[in-house]
Amino acid sequence: MSTLVQCGYFERGQCQSCRHIKLPMAQQLAAKNLELQQLLAPFVDKTEPQFLPPVVGDSSGFRNKAKMVALGAAHAPVLGIVSPSGEAVSLCDCLLYPTDMQALLHRLERFVQQAGIPPYRVDKAKGELKFILLTRSQVRGEYMLRFVLRSRDAIARIERELPTLMAEYPQIKVVSVNLQPVHMAILEGEEEIFLTENTRLEERFNDVPLFIRPKSFFQTNPQVAAKLYQTAREWVADFAPASLWDLFCGVGGFGLHCAAKDIPLTGIEIEAEAIACAKMSAQLMGLDKVEFMALDSTDFAKGEAAQTKPELIIVNPPRRGIGESLCHSLSEFAPKAILYSSCNPKTLAKDLGHIRGYRLTKVQLFDLFPHSDHFEVLALLVKD
């Protein structure tokens, strides 16, 4: 584990996103682990060791997604952030990104200049380019590039320059324009216009093929995420469940790692694009007892109250947690075990207070977000 990452942006006071970057990784990890243990102490099963050693990855070059604010002017664009002092700062050399991603981000600044696309000015409500979103697949080093625009006015300019860019960077496989016409701090709008025939990026974690589309959620630290999915697979296998639910399933990462040809799996996710990706993965894996549906997970669970109940349920909610209603539904279903993957230990602790009849037998921290306060937690609840 490396000790310190030397970041010029942080040293100059231009970017404070990695607020703990001056601390050695071991110290960062110890603080996160202590917070986790204090939050979950009221729920742990005192009869067996629950807190497993934290799982870590690289401290730099690990991030697969860049969200760049478009700043500056058409003749001198800047992709990055507004610093605390109000200046436009290019973050193309951010050390969280792999070196090939840094190089492409620099090229995209030149692309915006060559295309003559004016960055959107929030103070004047004028301009076209709001964000550039870049996602990298670790398995092949391929990219999905998205331009978030105020209107369609700049699309022709993007299309004019795109062949040159893709000739230089053939690893760019998906390019799209997202229209976000609202004068609000919203990352993306409803309409997505593809400028390439390909509409998805292929990824692979362990032996599981996964797909990324523009609006589908995907873990930003693939190195540690692969370990997270593999751990979930191993914990679930100990129960040999006859049936599985994967709620808030996203593109299917957890469920597909835990599935088998003879085990029925139901995956539920509100985002239709993610469900389309999960279905493609299941087909590639030859899983014919898998059903993925674009539904609200809480509503689905309520509707299934009188139906056949799964032997094990996986939940991977957003930061808000699963909520009291779904906690009660899970308690009523009474599966053998509940596997809870959380990106917010505070809401995890709150949810654990509403799940009845279970003991917390395993907890493990996965440091997907070095230098920040955030981390992922995998928690195993077993029926009393």
UniProtKB/Swiss-Prot annotation:
Active site: C343
Pfam families reported for this sequence: tRNA_U5-meth_tr
PROSITE patterns referenced in this protein's UniProt entry, alphabetically: SAM_MT_RNA_M5U, TRMA_1, TRMA_2
Catalytic activity: uridine(747) in 23S rRNA + S-adenosyl-L-methionine = 5-methyluridine(747) in 23S rRNA + S-adenosyl-L-homocysteine + H(+)
Molecular-function GO terms, alphabetical: 4 iron, 4 sulfur cluster binding; iron ion binding; rRNA (uridine-C5-)-methyltransferase activity
Residues involved in [4Fe-4S] cluster binding: C7, C15, C18, C94
Signal peptide: none
UniProt EC number: 2.1.1.189
An individual GO BP term: rRNA base methylation
CDD domains reported in the protein's UniProt record: AdoMet_MTases (cd02440)
Keywords: 4Fe-4S, Iron, Iron-sulfur, Metal-binding, Methyltransferase, rRNA processing, S-adenosyl-L-methionine, Transferase
EC top class, as a word: transferase
Top-rank taxon, per record: Bacteria
InterPro entries, A to Z: 23SrRNA_MeTrfase_RlmC, MeTrfase_TrmA_AS, MeTrfase_TrmA_CS, SAM-dependent_MTases_sf, U5_MeTrfase_fam
Binding residues annotated for S-adenosyl-L-methionine, in chain numbering: Q219, F248, E269, N316
Family: Belongs to the class I-like SAM-binding methyltransferase superfamily. RNA M5U methyltransferase family. RlmC subfamily.
Function description: Catalyzes the formation of 5-methyl-uridine at position 747 (m5U747) in 23S rRNA.
Name of protein: 23S rRNA (uracil(747)-C(5))-methyltransferase RlmC
Organism: Shewanella sp. (strain ANA-3)
Name of the gene this protein is made from: rlmC
